[in-house]
Amino acid sequence: MFITPGPNNAMLTISGLKFGFKRSLPHISGIAFGHAIQVSLICLGLGFILIDYPGLQIVLRWLCFGYLLYLAYQMVGSIKDYKKESGRPLKVYEAALFQWVNPKAWTIAITVASGFMPLEEKLWIAVLFTGLMSSLVSFPCISMWALFGSLIKTMISNQFIKKFIEYLFAILLVLTGFYLVLN
């Protein structure tokens, strides 16, 4: 699930495109770190809060949808001059915090916790192991999206391709938001 399209991977593609792979590493690390913490807390029982209070899940979906709309709006026209980098990639803590309003991250975390956490082990060891493994698996998967973005950076000199990429990713973010809210 880490490698499939979603909010994190769309943002990483644009980060790789705008800032290159190396400068996107804090963003990648923040996602992996934030997700490991999220998985660990769900393994400790936080997932039951979402089950007991389904309204909270709806609130998370709408927060994520709003953020994705904001990102889509920011994305159009954001690739002004690929040689002059404006702005900055997300910092580790910003990417880690985004996981808490990302419904796909919640879905993955609950799936990982329910499907892969060894129940016969000591709880703390199992939680640490599950969180660590989640982070180790996610890192190369999400890194591929930033790498993809940095590779297509060379095509941005063509104005048509530049606009196409901007609008494509903006539309994909909006569609992802609609999918998250409607499901």
Annotate each PLM feature:
Residues 51-80, 138-141, 145, 153-183:
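Selective transmembrane alpha-helices of multi-pass membrane proteins
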Residues 31, 95-99, 131-138:
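Residue-level signature of transmembrane alpha-helical cores of multipass secondary-active transporters
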Residues 1-5, 61-63, 132-140:
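Structural signature of hydrophobic alpha-helical transmembrane segments
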Residues 41-44, 101-113, 171-183:
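Hydrophobic alpha-helical transmembrane segments in multi-pass integral membrane proteins
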Residues 1-58, 108-130:
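Juxtamembrane transmembrane-helix termini in multi-pass membrane transport proteins
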Residues 23-91, 148-151:
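Membrane helix-loop-helix hairpins that form the core translocation module of multi-pass transporters
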